[in-house]
Amino acid sequence: MEKESSLPLETVSHVDLNRYMGVWYEIARYPNSFQKGCVGSRAPYKLLDDGKVSVLNECYDGSFSGQLRSAKGKAWIVDKETNSKLKVSFFWFFAGDYWIIDIADDYSYVVVGHPKRKYLWILSRNKTMEDDTFAGILKRLTEIHHYDTSKLIKTIQQ
C-alpha cells in the first residue's frame, strides 16, 4: 500500500476569498509543536488591499484562565485559479503550506491540510460542530484525502 503522504492531496475547486474572511474556531487538529497546550483556538482572517490575507492565530495557554497567546502572520494565494492553495508565514524566514481540502457550501466549516499530510485543521464559524457534520468530514478525510483521523485531537472551546 502506498504511503499516505505520497498520494497527491486534492484541494477544493474554488474558494471565494471574501466569503472565507472572518473568524474561524478550531474544532480539531493534528498535534503540532506550535499549538501545544492550546485551548479556545481561533483565527480571524482579513483580506488586505494588496490581495494578501492577515492572519491572527489565538489560543489560551493550558486553560481558559491561562495567558492568551497570539501569532500574527500573512498568507498569500499560490494557486490563483482556485484560491485553495496558500502559503502562510508567521516569521519572515518561514512559510508553510495551507491547502483548503474541504469546505461547506455555506462556508460554515473548512478543512485545512498540508500536501504531505503533516498538518490538519478542522475549523468552524461556530465554537461547536454538529456530530453528523464532524463524522462526514472524518469520513471524507479518510476515504478521499487519505488522512489518519485517529491522530486528530479535539480542541476545547468555551
Model region roles, listed by residue range:
Residues M1-Q158:
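A beta-rich soluble binding module of mature secreted/lumenal proteins
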